[in-house]
Regions:
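RNA-contacting regions in translation and RNA-metabolism proteins
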Residues: 1-353
Length: 353
């Protein structure tokens, strides 16, 4: 590429892609100096003068004026320096212009390649910055492909120039859901990782944060801070338990989340493909909180351990299986929700004591 072509290309990239000319020019200057050093062994100090007004690039090799030359790549004799200009003395630095033909050859061989590579780096950096600022937010993506072998889904996140591709792994999809190409789904942005092939956007649908953000979007009282989500325990695709608290005694936190005729919670259940959601009222009283967490089972008594976060819960005999849940799920989620180890016993066990 000729110099004027380089300037024209950078101006176009800044206008159409939003990539600054200074960023790209820095990449080009670095590539040109590296290429020259590679072709001229021993040369160390190479500078490129950028004249944006004249749309010119000029390359110089810098050498120090010395009495006795030991390294021709970095030094020049006083006589040679005086031949250029009588002003030079020992210790001065001389800028020796690189022949225009040679510089043109280097620019032609590296300019286009560097612009392409710099474009990739710049776009990669822009994608990283864009999505790194959206961590722990909900994004909407369109399924573009399903890998029939692994079940992984490729998604297009965002629109226009800000759109990027992301991979939703099979293990991070909601259990039991079947995704199809063209389907729009909500995902939760957990992390953005820098990788050689570009940023990796981590977007599971299994994270508890997805449920929290969905309620924030659906329930105005949560969005404005009147109702708080204190804790969430989730087994994606099956069941979620969520503890809520109201900062206004006139607002029922559970009712706010459920909504009129269950509209709010049902909307979220639909998004999560039928996942059951238990909403309980948070309490600062551990025993009361634990009892509520084991809903829908009734609790007769909660005995807290004297040390550590553990307890024994007594339930009616006919509700033992309900309290424990299928494959222990209800008890397991309750324990995670409240942060206590829970030992559930039937009422007959209490009588035997």
């Amino acid at each position: 590429m000729k110099c004027d072509e380089i300037f024209a290309a950078l101006a176009m990239l800044e206008k159409e892609r939003g990539i600054s000319q200074s960023f790209m020019m820095e990449k080009i200057v670095q590539a040109l100096t590296t290429a020259y050093k590679r072709d001229h062994e021993g040369v160390e100090n190479v500078v490129v003068d950028v004249d944006e007004g004249k749309r010119e690039l000029k390359m110089f090799v810098q050498k120090e004026v010395v009495d006795e030359v030991e390294n021709p790549g970095t030094q020049m004799s006083l006589d040679d320096a005086k031949a250029i200009s009588a002003k030079y003395n020992v210790g001065d630095i001389v800028n020796i212009p690189v022949d225009n033909i040679e510089f043109g050859r280097i620019a032609a061989g590296n300019g286009k390649q560097v612009i392409i590579q710099g474009l990739r780096e710049a776009e990669s950096g822009m994608v990283y910055d864009e999505y790194n600022s959206k961590q722990h937010e909900i994004l909407t993506g369109v399924v573009t492909r399903i890998d029939p072998r692994t079940g992984n889904a490729s998604l297009r996140i965002g629109t226009g120039t800000e759109a990027t591709d992301a991979l939703l792994l099979a293990g991070e999809q909601v259990k039991g859901e079947t995704l199809v190409e063209g389907q729009r789904i909500k995902v939760y942005l957990v992390d953005v990782r820098r990788q050689s092939r570009g940023p990796q956007v981590v977007i599971p649908r299994t994270h508890p944060g997805l449920v929290k953000r969905l309620f924030e979007l659906e329930v105005p009282e949560i969005y404005d801070g009147t109702v708080e989500i204190r804790s969430i325990a989730r087994e994606a695709g099956s069941r979620t338990k969520m503890a809520v608290w109201s900062n206004d005694e006139n607002v029922d936190p559970i009712g706010a989340c459920v909504g009129p005729h269950g509209q709010r919670v049902n909307s979220i259940v639909d998004e999560l493909r039928g996942e059951k959601i238990d909403i309980i009222k948070y309490s600062d009283d551990p025993a009361e909180y634990i009892a509520a967490a084991l809903a829908p089972a009734d609790v007769i008594d909660v005995r807290l351990a004297e040390e550590g976060k553990a307890c024994r819960v007594i339930v009616p005999d006919d509700q033992l299986s309900l309290a424990i849940g299928k494959e222990g799920q209800n008890a397991r989620l309750a324990a995670r929700l409240v942060g206590y180890k829970i030992d559930i016993k039937p009422e007959s066990y209490k009588e035997e004591e």
